[in-house]
């Protein structure tokens, strides 16, 4: 996994002292992507490998989500999936999770399946869905990528953390088919809580990226930051546990078949 690119971030604290930030409403509109397919007669989808061998990034050459939503993720077994496209992709054996970025889709698979069999099906489902003008989301997720919008109630340190994530860290993470979500800052311990999403969530090098990449950059520009930790939502922990049980059953059945 690539580390976030280091870009000039001079006079950060001075800039925030002079800058005024307006409060941001959490309200949003349900996304119905009519605009994205009005002029499309044929869609050309390309795929890119990610640092996570179990995740592929698919780029259809059009915006999947509007800026008001940013990104959203669905995992097998999480319950309600407010995405017709994600529901279709989950019908493919082996699909573990679906991540929608602004203009890309990251599909993650279980360790016991092969892309050679899955990839053509994924291409077909995405192509058919987008070509028909079907909505990507049936309603807006409860949590979007508005985590780095600077609020009037944010402290100067939190505002700087959000700005650095949005301008320097997030673009590099998205290149790898994932995203990073700001979950909070504990001023007493200097701990930044982040959630890795998409291809980065299950990548074997995610811990290295978190500590040697993101943490190093935040500590360099913001001395108040002492540590960066990854967090999971309760429903995500349950979904991961259930999928691991499912994979264990599949692998167990394969071993029994091989021993016969």
Curated annotation (Swiss-Prot):
One GO MF term attached to the UniProt entry: 4 iron, 4 sulfur cluster binding
Superkingdom as given in the UniProt entry: Eukaryota
Family annotation (Pfam families): Nfu_N, NifU
Residue ranges of the region described as NifU: 161-231
Disulfide topology: none
GO terms for cellular component: mitochondrial [4Fe-4S] assembly complex; mitochondrial matrix; mitochondrion
Cross-referenced InterPro entries: FSCA_dom_sf, Nfu/NifU_N, Nfu/NifU_N_sf, NFU1-like, NIF_FeS_clus_asmbl_NifU_C
Gene Ontology biological process terms, A to Z: iron-sulfur cluster assembly
UniProt family annotation: Belongs to the NifU family.
Protein name: NifU-like protein C1709.19c
Annotated organism of origin: Schizosaccharomyces pombe (strain 972 / ATCC 24843)
């Amino acid at each position: 996994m690539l580390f976030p690119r280091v870009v000039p971030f001079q006079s950060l604290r001075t800039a925030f002292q002079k800058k005024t930030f307006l409060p941001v409403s959490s309200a949003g509109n349900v996304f119905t992507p009519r605009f994205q397919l009005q002029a499309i007669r044929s869609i050309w989808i390309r795929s890119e490998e990610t640092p996570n061998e179990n995740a592929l990034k698919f780029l259809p050459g059009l915006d999947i989500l509007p800026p008001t939503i940013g990104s959203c993720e669905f995992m097998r077994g999480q319950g309600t999936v407010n995405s017709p496209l994600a529901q279709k992709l989950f019908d493919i054996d082996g699909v573990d999770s679906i991540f929608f970025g602004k203009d890309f889709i990251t599909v993650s698979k279980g360790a016991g399946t092969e892309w050679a069999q899955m990839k053509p099906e994924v291409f077909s489902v995405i192509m058919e869905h987008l070509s028909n003008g079907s909505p990507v989301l049936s309603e807006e997720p409860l949590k979007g990528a508005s985590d780095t919008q600077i609020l009037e109630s944010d402290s100067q340190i939190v505002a700087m953390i959000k700005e650095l994530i949005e301008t320097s860290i997030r673009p590099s993470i998205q290149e790898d088919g994932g995203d990073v979500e700001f979950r909070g800052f504990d001023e007493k311990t200097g701990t930044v809580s982040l959630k890795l999403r998409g291809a980065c969530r299950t990548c074997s090098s995610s811990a290295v990226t978190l500590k040697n990449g993101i943490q190093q950059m935040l500590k360099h520009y913001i001395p108040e930051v002492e540590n960066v930790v990854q967090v999971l939502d309760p429903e995500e922990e349950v979904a991961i546990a259930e999928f691991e049980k499912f994979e264990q059953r599949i692998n167990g059945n394969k071993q029994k078949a091989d021993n016969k």
